[in-house]
From Swiss-Prot:
Database matches in PROSITE patterns: PRD_2 (PS51372), PTS_EIIA_TYPE_2 (PS51094)
Protein's gene: mtlR
Name this protein carries in UniProt: Putative transcriptional regulator MtlR
InterPro entries to which the protein is assigned, alphabetical: BglG_antiterminators (IPR050661), Mga_HTH (IPR007737), PRD (IPR011608), PTrfase/Anion_transptr (IPR016152), PTS_EIIA_type-2_dom (IPR002178), WH-like_DNA-bd_sf (IPR036388)
Biological role stated in the UniProt entry: Not necessary for mannitol utilization. May be involved in regulation of the mannitol phosphoenolpyruvate-dependent sugar phosphotransferase system (PTS).
Domain PRD, residue spans: 276-382
Domain of life: Bacteria
PANTHER family: CRYPTIC BETA-GLUCOSIDE BGL OPERON ANTITERMINATOR (PTHR30185), TRANSCRIPTIONAL REGULATOR MTLR (PTHR30185:SF18)
EC top class, as a word: transferase
GO biological process: regulation of DNA-templated transcription
Native species: Streptococcus mutans serotype c (strain ATCC 700610 / UA159)
EC code: 2.7.1.-
A Pfam short name: PTS_EIIA_2
Key words of the record: Kinase, Phosphoprotein, Transcription, Transcription regulation, Transferase
PTS EIIA type-2 domain mapped to chain residues: 490-640
C-alpha cells in the first residue's frame, strides 16, 4: 500500500497519540479543515484494504482493527506543490540543457497535467525577475546570467533554514559543491565584522552567492561601486581564491561587490554619514508610510519605530524575496489581516504601486500590513484612546490595574481615575470608554475586576482593541507638554546648531550645479569652498536628494573642510532643476544644507542625524521645511532636538 506524505504523517500521529481531535489534526498538518477531512477519507480507504478503520467517538478520531498490519505500509515520496515548484526551478537553474516533461513526471511521481500547471506557474513567477522559459525540446531558463546566478542564491536561501544551513544539512540541494559552500561560510563569517549588521538570512544569501562564484560566466557590471563594497569583495575573494586554488576574474569580484553595494552598503538606516546611499529606497519607505496615513486617515508617521521596522523588513525581502511559499500555512500575519481588511487593501495597492514586481506576493502584503497593524496596537501616539476608571480601591490596587491595562493595550494614552460616586453620565463624552471595578446601572460602563485573571485580561484586551478600532468622537481636554532634559553634552550641541542655523534668500545662477558654489560662498564655517562644492555635487550625482513633489533639495556631507557643523536653508531667487530621490527631475526652489565636521562629537552627529531623518522620513516635517519661515523652522529644530533628548533620557 502506498501513502502520501500527509497521510503518513497523520497515521504516525495516530500511532503516537492514539486519539486525535479535528483541531489537533489541523494544527499537525497545517492545512484547512476541508483538507483534513479529505486526508482522513483517503487514509481510511487505504487502511480498509488491510482491515483497519478510522472511527470517530466524542469528537476524537482513532484507529481500530488489525493494527499489526500497519507494518506492510510503504510511504510514497511525494511533494507539496510549493516544494515541487522550488525543486523544478532549482533543476532548471542548474541544468545547461533542456529538461523534458517526461523527466519531471518520473522524478516527482505526478501526471503530465500537473507538470504543465507547475511549469505555467514557474514561468509566470520568473517573469517578475525578467527571465523566460524556452520550450524547445523541453524546458530551459533563458535570461541575464547575473540574474540567473542571483536567483539561484535567492532560491537556495528560501529553501535552506538558518539552522539547516548552519549544520550543513542541504536536503534536496546536495548537488551543490558542499566543500566550497563550507569554505565560503568560514571566509564570509570571519570577515563579516567589516560590514554593517546583517540579518542571518542576508548573511546566508551572500555566503551562497560567494560559493556560486564561477557558476555560469557572469556579465559586466555597469554602475559605480562604493569603496566599502569593493574592499570587502577583494578581501574575501583573495582568501577564497587561495583556499579553493582557483582564479576568479575581476568581473566576479565586481559582480559580488555590486550586489553587496545594492543590498547592504547603500541601504543603511542612517544615511547621513554615508557618501553613497539608495535615496530611492529611503523615499519609497517614507512614501509608503505617508500614503497609508493619507488613505486611512491615521498618522502612522507619529510612530517613531515604524520606519525602522519597515526599512529592515523590506530591505531583507527585496534582497531575498520569497519565490514560492507554502500557501497552506496560516500565519499570524494572515490572521491579523482578517481584522484589518481596509488597511490590508490600502497597503496591497500601495506596495504594488511603489515596489518592484518580484515583491508582489500576498504573504508580503500581509506582513507589511502586520507592521502597520502592530503600530496601531503598539503606540499611544498613533490611534490613542482615553479611559475613565471608576473605582474605590486603594491607590496601590488601582495603579496595579492601570499598569496591567497599559501592558495589554499600549495604545491607551491616558487612564483617569474617579471614585464610583463621582461618576456622571456626561463623563462618557470625554472618554473612549468607561471601566468600573463594581457593577453599575449604566450598561455602557464595562465591569472589570480589581485583580483580573488571565482569561479576563484577554477579554479586556479584545474589548479595548475593539474600542480603538471603532473610536467615537470625544471632547478632549487641552494637554500641556512638559519638556525637560539634563544631558549637558546634547544641550551644548543643541545650542550650537540653533546658533549656527540661518535662513536666507540667495540670488543664484540659473542651474543647480552653479548654484551650489554660490551657496558655499556664503558659509563662513567652510575653509575650502571650491573643494566642498565639488564634493557636494559629486555626492548628489551618486545619491540625489531632491525630495519628490516638494521643490526641496538636501545637500549634506561630512568633511575636514567644515570648521563648524551647521544646518542652513536657502530660498532660491531662480528655480533650478535637480535629480530627485526617485531619479526624476524636480524643480527646486529651496535648498537645505547640512555640513558636519569630520571629527565631530557623537552628540552633534546624533542631532544632525535627527535633522536628516526628519527631512527624509517625516512628511509632516518635510512640509514645514518646504513652506516654513525662519522662526517656524527654528521652532521645529528645537522640537526635534527636545524629542531626541527626551527619548535618550527615557
Amino acid at each position: 500500500m502506498l501513502l502520501t506524505k500527509r497521510e503518513k504523517h497523520l497515521l504516525a500521529a495516530f500511532q503516537n497519540y492514539g486519539k486525535l481531535s479535528l483541531k489537533q489534526m489541523i494544527d499537525l498538518l497545517k492545512v484547512s479543515q476541508r483538507t483534513v477531512y479529505r486526508t482522513i477519507s483517503d487514509l481510511t480507504d487505504s487502511l480498509n484494504t488491510i482491515n483497519i478503520s478510522i472511527i470517530k467517538e466524542n469528537q476524537n478520531y482513532f484507529l481500530v482493527g488489525e493494527l499489526a498490519n500497519l507494518a506492510s505500509i510503504i510511504s510514497l515520496d511525494t511533494y507539496e506543490q510549493y516544494e515541487r515548484l522550488n525543486l523544478i526551478t532549482y533543476k532548471l537553474l542548474m541544468s545547461f540543457s533542456s529538461i523534458t516533461n517526461e523527466q519531471l513526471q518520473e522524478e516527482f511521481n505526478v501526471s503530465n497535467v500537473t507538470i504543465i500547471q507547475d511549469i505555467a506557474e514557474i514561468e509566470k513567477r520568473l517573469a517578475d525577475f525578467d527571465l523566460r522559459l524556452d520550450r524547445k525540446k523541453g524546458y530551459r531558463l533563458v535570461g541575464n546570467k547575473n540574474t540567473l546566478r542571483r536567483l539561484l542564491a535567492i532560491l537556495l536561501t528560501n529553501n535552506l533554514s538558518i539552522s539547516d544551513f548552519g549544520a550543513g544539512a542541504y536536503g534536496h540541494f546536495e548537488v551543490l559543491d558542499k566543500a566550497k559552500l563550507e569554505l565560503a561560510k568560514q571566509i564570509f563569517q570571519s570577515s563579516q565584522e567589516d560590514l554593517p549588521d546583517l540579518d542571518a538570512k542576508m548573511s546566508e544569501f551572500f555566503i551562497i552567492l560567494l560559493a556560486l562564484s564561477g557558476w555560469r560566466d557572469n556579465e559586466a557590471v555597469g554602475h559605480s561601486i562604493s569603496k566599502a563594497a569593493l574592499d570587502f569583495s577583494q578581501k574575501v575573494y583573495t582568501e577564497f581564491s587561495q583556499k579553493t586554488n582557483q582564479f576568479y576574474s575581476i568581473q566576479e569580484i565586481l559582480y559580488y561587490a555590486s550586489i553587496l553595494d545594492e543590498l547592504v552598503i547603500k541601504r543603511q538606516e542612517t544615511p547621513l554619514f554615508h557618501e553613497k546611499f539608495d535615496s530611492a529606497f529611503f523615499y519609497n519607505i517614507s512614501n509608503l508610510i505617508d500614503k497609508v496615513s493619507l488613505y486611512t486617515k491615521i498618522n502612522f508617521a507619529k510612530d517613531k519605530t515604524l520606519f525602522h521596522f519597515l526599512f529592515n523588513h523590506i530591505r531583507l525581502n527585496l534582497a531575498v524575496p520569497q519565490i514560492f511559499e507554502d500557501k497552506s500555512n496560516n500565519t499570524i500575519a494572515h490572521e491579523v489581516v482578517q481584522g484589518n481588511e481596509y488597511l490590508h487593501r490600502v497597503v496591497s495597492l500601495l506596495v504594488q504601486d511603489i515596489f518592484p514586481k518580484y515583491l508582489q506576493k500576498e504573504p508580503e502584503y500581509e506582513l507589511i500590513t502586520l507592521h502597520f497593524a502592530s503600530s496601531l496596537r503598539r503606540s499611544p501616539d498613533i490611534y490613542p484612546i482615553k479611559i475613565l476608571l471608576l473605582t474605590d480601591e486603594r491607590p496601590l490596587a488601582r495603579e496595579l490595574l492601570i499598569t496591567r491595562i497599559k501592558t495589554i493595550a499600549p495604545f491607551v494614552d491616558k487612564v483617569v481615575v474617579k471614585e464610583l460616586a463621582q461618576y456622571e453620565t456626561k463623563d462618557k463624552d470625554y472618554y473612549n470608554c468607561v471601566l468600573a471595578t463594581k457593577p453599575l446601572v449604566d450598561k455602557a460602563v464595562k465591569m472589570v475586576s480589581t485583580y483580573p485573571d488571565a482569561k479576563e485580561m484577554l477579554q479586556l484586551q479584545d474589548y479595548l482593541q475593539n474600542v480603538q478600532a471603532h473610536q467615537k468622537i470625544i471632547i478632549r481636554d487641552e494637554q500641556t507638554n512638559k519638556q525637560g532634559y539634563n544631558l549637558q553634552n546634547y544641550f551644548l550641541a543643541t545650542q550650537q546648531l540653533l546658533q549656527e542655523f540661518s535662513y536666507q534668500e540667495i540670488d543664484n545662477p540659473a542651474d543647480f550645479e552653479t548654484s551650489v558654489p554660490k551657496i558655499m560662498e556664503t558659509i563662513a564655517a567652510v575653509s575650502d569652498k571650491t573643494y566642498l562644492s565639488s564634493k557636494l555635487l559629486k555626492c548628489f550625482a551618486v545619491s540625489p536628494l531632491a525630495i519628490p513633489e516638494t521643490h526641496l533639495a538636501l545637500l549634506h556631507t561630512q568633511s575636514s573642510k567644515v570648521i563648524t557643523s551647521c544646518f542652513k536653508i536657502y530660498d532660491l531667487k531662480r528655480p533650478v532643476t535637480a535629480l530627485s530621490m526617485n531619479y526624476e527631475k524636480e524643480t527646486v526652489t529651496r535648498i537645505l544644507v547640512m555640513l558636519t565636521r569630520l571629527d565631530e562629537t557623537k552628540e552633534m552627529r546624533d542631532l544632525m542625524t535627527a535633522i536628516s531623518q526628519s527631512i527624509i522620513e517625516n512628511h509632516l516635517y518635510t512640509e514645514i521645511y518646504k513652506t516654513g519661515n525662519k522662526d517656524i523652522i527654528y521652532q521645529l529644530l528645537n522640537q526635534i532636538f527636545t524629542e531626541k533628548i527626551k527619548k535618550l533620557e527615557t
